[in-house]
Design a protein with these regions (language model features):
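PEST-like low-complexity, intrinsically disordered acidic/proline/serine-rich tracts
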Residues: 1-210
Length: 210
């Protein structure tokens, strides 16, 4: 897959190719201590919302209710909640997955279903993207080898569902990470996820420091 040496294995310290780090971000990445992370009780720094969709993981996506979509990951055993409408509730504490607000970006002629105002009962139909804005994050890693993001980070995602002529379904996730503390410009990735026939390979595992 693309970015194999970052997604499938832990790259060496100082290998942050492709990430637009500023001087402060590079300094922190170059000081990464794998042994210190291993000894820490927090092994989930690379599993936050800015990075989790790039993990070599399976994703289980279900509706909690008409206005809340849940994404579960087997890598790191994480849960993301995507809230349709509204704003971040006052007093919400920052967290690894932050607070995500979702909306349908409909193509011409599209129709909103669940998450659409006044139209519960079905997913978005006939084209368009799911847009997700995530804030209220704690700091963590963009990559497992200590490439940092700060608690000032915001994440914008676009989810597009594609169906091949042979019936295979793909979820394309475009992720835009913006961090005024450690990045000189947005860090943009695109991840292709293929739908499996069933959940037989689903195997949640705890966060790892590799």
């Amino acid at each position: 897959t693309e970015d194999w040496r970052f997604r499938m294995v832990t790259a060496p310290k100082g290998d942050f190719a492709g990430v637009p780090l500023n001087a402060e971000g590079r300094k922190i990445a170059n000081e990464w201590d794998a042994a210190k992370d291993q000894a820490s009780s927090d092994h989930c720094k690379a599993y936050g919302a800015p990075a989790i969709m790039r993990e070599p993981s399976r994703f289980h996506i279900t509706w909690v209710d008409d206005n809340t979509l849940k994404i579960e990951t087997d890598a790191g055993n994480q849960i993301r909640l995507l809230h349709f409408g509204g704003a971040v509730p006052p007093g919400t504490k920052p967290s690894l997955q932050g607070y995500s607000i979702a909306s349908w970006q409909l193509a011409l002629g599209g129709r909103a279903g669940r998450g659409g105002q006044g139209q519960p009962g079905g997913a978005a139909q006939r084209g368009g993207s799911l847009k997700v804005m995530t804030t209220n994050l704690t700091s963590g890693y963009l990559r497992r080898n200590g490439v940092p993001y700060s608690d000032k980070t915001t994440v914008t995602e676009y989810y597009d569902l594609l169906r091949e002529s042979d019936g295979e379904q793909w979820l394309i996730v475009k992720t835009i990470v913006e961090d005024p503390q450690y990045l000189t410009e947005p860090f943009i990735t695109s991840t292709n996820l293929k739908k499996e026939a069933d959940g037989s390979k689903w195997k949640p595992e705890p966060c790892e420091v590799r």
